[in-house]
Amino acid sequence: MLGGLSLRHRVLAATAATVLIGSFAHGPVKAADLGGDCCADLEERIAELEATTVRKGNKKVSVTLYGQENHAALFWDDGAEKNFYVVDNNYESSRFGFKGTAKTGFGDWVGGYRLEVEPTGANSAKLNQFDDDNANDSAGPLNVRHSYMYLSSKTYGEGRMGLTATPIYNITKDTNVTELEDTMHSDNRMMQGFFLRSKGFDNAEGLSKLKWQNISSCYDSNNAFVCGTRKNGVAYWSPTWAGFSFSTGYFEDDEWGAALRYKNSFSLWGGGSGASEDDPWLVGAGIGYSKNTDERYQTGGGGDANGPNPPFPAPNNFRNFKRDVQDWAGSASIKHKPTGLFLFSAFSFSETNDTNTIHSGFYTGTSAPQMNGWDVQGGIQRDFDFLGLSKLGETSFWGGYEQINDGLASVSLGGNFPDNGKNFGGIPADRFLSANTIIGVAVPTEITGSEVTRWSLAFDQAVDSANMHLYAVYQHLTADVDLVTRDPTVSPTGKLKNVGAPLDDFDLFYTGGRIYF
């Protein structure tokens, strides 16, 4: 056993063994002379290496490599075009990272870090009818997801500093007791980057300038249910008390938020001993809030965002512009372990009081509407003997329905030139759409509302021995937009008129797998 030897003695022992084995392998020779100066140079080099390693008495850092691969074959139909892509499934993207921990020697406190990146190629959330590989992602071939250091205690919780999750991040998915959110969750990560298509326009010229995400998003992200993202800041995550955990944080520049999560098991009739693995019910829930006053959003910095909002002057400009976006969201899930039956639900609200969105509607003079969305899913997750599936792991079948209302994301990036005046989404703060923004709508309009619905069916098969999941999902989505105008070609008297804009449905089917390491 060499476990108790120093680096120097282990290398010397290995060298000696190599010399001895080599002497036998090459036939009878004189006994190897291991004395004298034969190993002096080697010892000197080892001493140099030891000087660059953690010395005895310092706290050693253990490093863990982790990650996952998640790929799918995507078949899609936008109402006219049908096609096939191979994608990186952004419901839970492929990624890898490093975690390091070290004991501080002070109670149970440990220090550590986390660095995590994801490849951006073929990101399913960024593909569309014209782009099947996302080769020119602005983040480059790799996107940094996490980069922070922390101090953690089982008793007092964990403090983080750096690029990390905001408290509300994933609040609508990470308390799901089935843990099926990596196959499909409430957002539309497989097609949100696709362009809307007008009914009756079946060629490339029939595609709108707006994407699905432009009418189904929070005011500060391209998602409707995962509004808060990962930001640069400081955060606190509590230990778990009887299933409850709390988190709060403050992030550049400026955003703050808090969240409460719960995950536990229970028995309807109690037992007097608290939660137990023998309890027949699993339950999870979470609720979170965030307030974002970052004038420049994700580009850092702050302060006034000056300059006009093209193509219109005041009052739709950025003079003394102030950001004010608020999000709150939550979820709940329950599973009956003996039968495998489960139910999941999520909700999300987002509103903006940005100074250039208040009473800024181009034709109506109204403020931006509140975005709201809800999702319900239900199914069964258990071992099935059919075709020997129970030998692999749990099998899950489920379906769901969701609705997202007024997800217009009509806010502006702010910041300094050239960002001032640019829109965060595809809809400006005054919600003005020029003629033919939506093909077939030949007059300028104001978009006052939207509705996106989705129903879905899904299958997931765990392969426990390989730490893998295989899955297949079908989704059907519909979209409606509310448009008004006072354009004289439609309203000679200048009265507010509704404008129709029928849009094609979107169907997709994807099947693939993910493996964790």
Model-derived features: where do they sit?
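Transmembrane beta-strands of outer-membrane beta-barrel pores
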Residues: 71-77, 117-121, 165-167, 250-254, ...
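Residue-level detector of the transmembrane beta-barrel scaffold of outer-membrane proteins
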Residues: 64-66, 110-114, 158-160, 245-247, ...
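Outer-membrane beta-barrel and related beta-rich outer-membrane complex signature
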Residues: 79, 125-127, 171-180, 297-299, ...
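Surface-exposed coil loops of outer-membrane beta-barrel proteins
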Residues: 84, 126-140, 160-247, 252-255, ...
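Transmembrane beta-barrel outer-membrane domains
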Residues: 58-60, 86-93, 139-144, 227-229, ...
